Regions:
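Phosphate/diphosphate-binding glycine-rich loops and adjacent basic-rich segments that engage nucleotide
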Residues: 1-62
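Structural motif
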Residues: 9-11, 20-23, 48-51, 70-71, ...
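A broadly conserved detector of short glycine/acidic/proline-rich loop/turn motifs that flank catalytic sites
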Residues: 16-18, 28, 77, 123-125, ...
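C-terminal alpha-helical cap/extension of soluble enzyme domains
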Residues: 130-165
Length: 175
């Protein structure tokens, strides 16, 4: 079996009226290729249901997964999202698409000819007081009770706080 869609990420970021931005950066696959490569190097298995071998059968063997395909997030909905990303970053911008992108790890016969699409909006383009509204939105979502009683984090929040915790200030000239 051969991949048709890439595992290209979709990303979204916005201000939150605090120092911690809202950043969602997610792959279109159940597992990213880098994690499969690490599992292969360490001789570890990958989770069941995230990849197929070259014969189209589910595998937990990292080496087999690298020779096969990664499965999309959310089943057919994820395939639809991956297709959308393929159209936006391939067809729409005039780069390779639909399984024509060369494997960056195994195919060095020429350029990949990959595409990117970036969109930016002024935060108050549609709503006058965006920062006030996003603050209310985040506050409302964080108040929702969840099954385990754990704190709800918005996308990017844990990573940002982790970076603050494990990063020490450096002299300016060292950067």
């Amino acid at each position: 079996k051969k991949s048709v869609f890439g595992t290209n990420p979709i990303c979204f970021g916005t201000q939150t009226n605090s120092k911690v931005p809202f950043i969602l950066d997610t792959s279109m696959s159940m597992i990213n290729r880098g994690k499969i490569r690490i599992a292969e190097k360490l001789g570890k298995k990958i989770p069941y249901g995230v990849a197929l071998n070259k014969f189209g059968k589910p595998t937990t063997n990292a080496k087999e997964a690298l020779a096969g395909v990664q499965l999309p997030i959310a089943g057919f909905r994820g395939s639809g999202l991956a297709w959308m990303v393929d159209i936006l970053t391939g067809v729409f911008v005039g780069s390779n698409h639909g399984g024509k992108v060369k494997d960056p790890f195994d195919d060095f016969s020429g350029p990949q000819n990959i595409g990117h699409l970036f969109l930016a909006f002024k935060d108050n383009l549609f709503v006058k007081d965006y920062k006030k509204e996003i603050k209310k939105n985040i506050k409302r979502i964080k108040k929702i009770p969840n099954l385990k009683g754990q704190k709800i984090f918005y996308p990017g929040e844990q990573k940002f706080l982790s970076c603050l915790l494990y990063t020490s200030p450096s002299p300016r000239d060292a950067i």
